[in-house]
Amino acid sequence: MPNVRIPTLSSLLRVLAASAIFPATGALHAQALPPGVRLGMTADELQAALPAAERVHRPQRLTGGLLGSWRAAPVEMAGLVFEPTFFFAASELRRVEYVATAQSAPDSGASAFGQLVQWGRGVFGNELASRDPGSAYAAWTSGDTDVYVQQISDPRRASVRLVYKARQLRDGSEL
């Protein structure tokens, strides 16, 4: 007879309890990339997946030829409203940024940052983290994707950022 493992009632209750915690945090419904969106897709594929996505009139430019040329409707995560921007390079989606201003939040976004870090731990495992007096950062790697959450706590420019980006491995000779 094959060795079939049947979940016990206690293990099912643990799974249900864990899933009940997630909606309570307010952070878990929108961190994943939108349905149908994946890094490496073209702008036409992005438009097909997100028909409401709009071209940005003044695209943000980042190093590596990244151009933040598309945006989607704001989404609420962890008590803040995040604006998603889609960055392309070489005709491929390479980066998705969710950015929320947090100047009006009494904690400058620290609570939202903490909720997003908890979400990241649940999805990706332990993070690589750093903290200094003006910011906090937590990062994970999942396959060919780097994911990070950053909080800037300066009251004049407080913000929280969640970023998905295509992983770029460098050869030591390139450094």
Placement of each model-derived feature along the sequence:
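Bacterial N-terminal signal peptides that target proteins for export
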Residues: 2-16
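Non-cytosolic coordination micro-motifs
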Residues: 29-67, 95, 99-175
